[in-house]
């Protein structure tokens, strides 16, 4: 009798995706210096049309996707955002609108509600209007955001406030908590900047010091206790001050896929920064084939690609080696241990880099923009 074929390791099994990040457009009225979009932004002329997005959603539902995050850029800049939202509802997909709340967002909100929108995630750059508008690069944005948030709660939609934290607004963490309560939000994300995309370019302008980070964590933990049952507060700490890396996107190719405005499918926001990866487009391949067969998703899925110390670490199926894009940017090799991990030989250097930049006077922001040739000030610096 032939011996039974051994079951594959759980790390090698390709799970069904849970979430789809639908980057409907890169157009956005805000110009945030920490934007996670790539430096080379897709133009409107390259965006997928309505029928392509409806097909993507249908295929996503067939794959087992549960949540669709309608994002951008500013997703309400799309004239077909209501139709796309209605398709999510028709397919039973939980829809989360990730929005700046400015421009045409308020004018479309009631129609989105009628179409079956499930949840709204509103970005707030600061509590003080002048500071918020300096960070976002758009005057008179704050009153629009407050009007938008008020209408969200009037409609009975669950509201999450998203506050990306950096040295320019870290002093406002208590104010973000108070604002979330005032607006009737169900959830607040206190998300320290993750240094990819435009945030990597602006790292020296955005990096807070360790004492500020520790104090912000203390404030959040106290507020969690005080507001238990009223407000859920999610906290994302900066990798540069962490002990262990986070499981980027829940693990490469394990939970989430990101479809760009032109239909390129990525395992994470910044995956395009890794040279040599072959990305497939929804215009050429079915979404299911991309998830299971595309070279980019296979490249760092599971644990087989890992080097030491990740390969033998008991955390390898918890954080999946951390962020591949950060490993590349800071060590020169995407397969290296993420230096956010205390087990990385470069961890101390990463901490020192953060300490040095936080101690310097911050340079001016390089604002996110389409069609501008951005010179990355870090491009001439050697990795750690």
From Swiss-Prot:
Pfam name, any one: SPASM
Annotated metabolic or biological route of this protein: Cofactor biosynthesis; pyrroloquinoline quinone biosynthesis
MF term (GO), any: 4 iron, 4 sulfur cluster binding
Cofactor(s) of this protein: [4Fe-4S] cluster
Cofactor descriptive note: Binds 1 [4Fe-4S] cluster. The cluster is coordinated with 3 cysteines and an exchangeable S-adenosyl-L-methionine.
Enzyme class: oxidoreductase
EC number(s) from the headed UniProt entry: 1.21.98.4
GO biological process, one term: pyrroloquinoline quinone biosynthetic process
Alphabetized UniProt keyword annotations: 4Fe-4S, Iron, Iron-sulfur, Metal-binding, Oxidoreductase, PQQ biosynthesis, S-adenosyl-L-methionine
Segments forming domain Radical SAM core: 14-226
Reaction(s) the record says it catalyses: [PQQ precursor protein] + S-adenosyl-L-methionine = E-Y cross-linked-[PQQ precursor protein] + 5'-deoxyadenosine + L-methionine + H(+)
Cross-referenced PANTHER family: PQQA PEPTIDE CYCLASE (PTHR11228:SF7), RADICAL SAM DOMAIN PROTEIN (PTHR11228)
Subunit structure: Interacts with PqqD. The interaction is necessary for activity of PqqE.
Role, per record: Catalyzes the cross-linking of a glutamate residue and a tyrosine residue in the PqqA protein as part of the biosynthesis of pyrroloquinoline quinone (PQQ).
Protein name per Swiss-Prot or TrEMBL: PqqA peptide cyclase
Species of origin: Methylorubrum populi (strain ATCC BAA-705 / NCIMB 13946 / BJ001) (Methylobacterium populi)
